[in-house]
């Protein structure tokens, strides 16, 4: 009788929310896990999702598959709350495919670095996409509105009478394909799930890691990283065999460190890659390029910097090009022929080429097979899963071995 109950497919129809289907766990364990997926993704990747479920159950988690044509975050959260009240206790959830995104306002006191005036800047810029809406059931929110352009985005305000500290009820993650990458997203999700199942079956010890620090991070203070070695020694004790299995890299080591990092990312034995850098949804800021050398080198550097400042002021329409050049000439006591080589087009081309060499961008990752099983982005925005293209997504959706990213 118990076997029949566990193999049965339970379908709940909730008034006002539409049809939600719940496949109950196939085995009984101490804790439970939930796969939350949209109907279309499940239809297109059903076999891969079920294989993923089986791998989780083999790992000791009673696993639900919850699917629906989700209309808003509240609908998803209602199902999670119901599961959380069941036995065994819910340990974690994963969101696969097109699950609505909650963007939170009135909660910047709980963000590490993101601070933006919510009254002065538009909602998409000044709101924080966060799955704490789903996994921290202590928090309470007021719904504001649905985004009129990106209809999978919904804005919520953290209530003043809500708890004001993060205390997640369980852990959560997302498997969301970055559609800017192109291709069939359902095929890519199925391929990723197969990779996750494959890696879970491997007997792979964590015995190889690389930690990288980019320019401008922690004020470029080397002393700030002295304790990282102690922490990693305690957490990854098997990795300290030689300089290849426990490696620390710094942006100063080469003029353009991104190419050195590409070599590290493609090593098959890599288990963990730690990035400490500044970031954007579509870029990892790695270095600043080569330092000036000699008198002429510094003169060229100063000239290039001033040209870039002038170009920026012209683009901001702070005056005519002649007025802006006259201001800089007077401010910095420049010679009369200092701007004779000034060209907006030439500066834009030079800056673009330099930017490509000093950062890892989405186009780089599109052709790269990343192999560290886990990649951490200690950086702003690299994990912006609500964007069509985001760095963390490109690391897991390729033919390498990366299965988990944190950003």
Predicted regions and their residues:
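Bacterial Sec-dependent N-terminal signal peptides
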Residues: 1-20
């Amino acid at each position: 009788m118990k076997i029949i109950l566990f193999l049965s497919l339970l379908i709940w129809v909730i008034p006002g929310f539409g049809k939600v289907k719940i496949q109950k766990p196939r085995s009984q364990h101490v804790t439970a896990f939930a796969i939350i997926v949209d109907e279309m993704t499940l239809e297109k990747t059903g076999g891969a999702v079920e294989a993923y479920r089986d791998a989780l159950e083999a790992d000791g988690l009673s696993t639900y598959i919850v699917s629906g044509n989700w209309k808003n975050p509240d609908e998803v959260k209602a199902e999670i709350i119901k599961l959380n009240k069941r036995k065994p206790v819910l340990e974690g959830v994963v969101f696969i495919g097109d699950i609505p995104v909650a963007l939170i306002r009135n909660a910047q006191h709980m963000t590490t670095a993101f601070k933006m005036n919510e009254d002065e800047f538009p909602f998409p810029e000044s709101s924080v996409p966060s799955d704490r809406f789903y996994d921290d059931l202590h928090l309470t929110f007021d719904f504001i509105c649905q985004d009129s352009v990106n209809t999978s985005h919904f804005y919520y305000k953290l209530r003043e009478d809500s708890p004001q500290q993060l205390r997640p009820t369980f852990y959560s993650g997302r498997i969301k394909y970055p559609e800017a990458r192109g291709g069939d997203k359902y095929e890519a999700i199925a391929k990723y799930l197969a990779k996750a199942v494959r890696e879970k079956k491997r007997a792979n010890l964590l015995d190889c890691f690389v930690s990288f620090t980019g320019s401008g991070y922690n004020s470029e203070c080397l002393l700030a990283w002295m304790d990282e070695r102690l922490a990693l020694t305690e957490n990854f004790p098997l990795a300290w065999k030689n300089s290849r299995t426990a490696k620390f890299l710094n942006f100063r080591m080469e003029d353009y460190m991104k190419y050195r990092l590409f070599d590290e990312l493609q090593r098959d034995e890599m288990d963990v890659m730690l990035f400490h850098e500044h970031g954007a949804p579509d870029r990892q800021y790695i270095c600043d390029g080569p330092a000036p050398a000699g008198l002429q080198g510094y003169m060229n550097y100063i000239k290039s910097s001033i040209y870039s400042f002038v170009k920026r002021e012209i683009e901001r329409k702070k005056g005519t090009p002649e007025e802006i050049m006259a201001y800089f000439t007077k401010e910095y006591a420049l010679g009369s022929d200092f701007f004779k080589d000034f060209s907006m087009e030439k500066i834009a081309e030079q800056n673009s080429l330099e930017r490509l060499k000093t950062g890892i961008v989405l186009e780089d990752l599109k052709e790269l097979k990343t192999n560290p099983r886990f990649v951490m982005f200690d950086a702003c925005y690299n994990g912006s899963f609500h964007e069509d293209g985001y760095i963390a997504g490109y690391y897991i959706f390729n033919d390498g071995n990366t299965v988990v990213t944190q950003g």
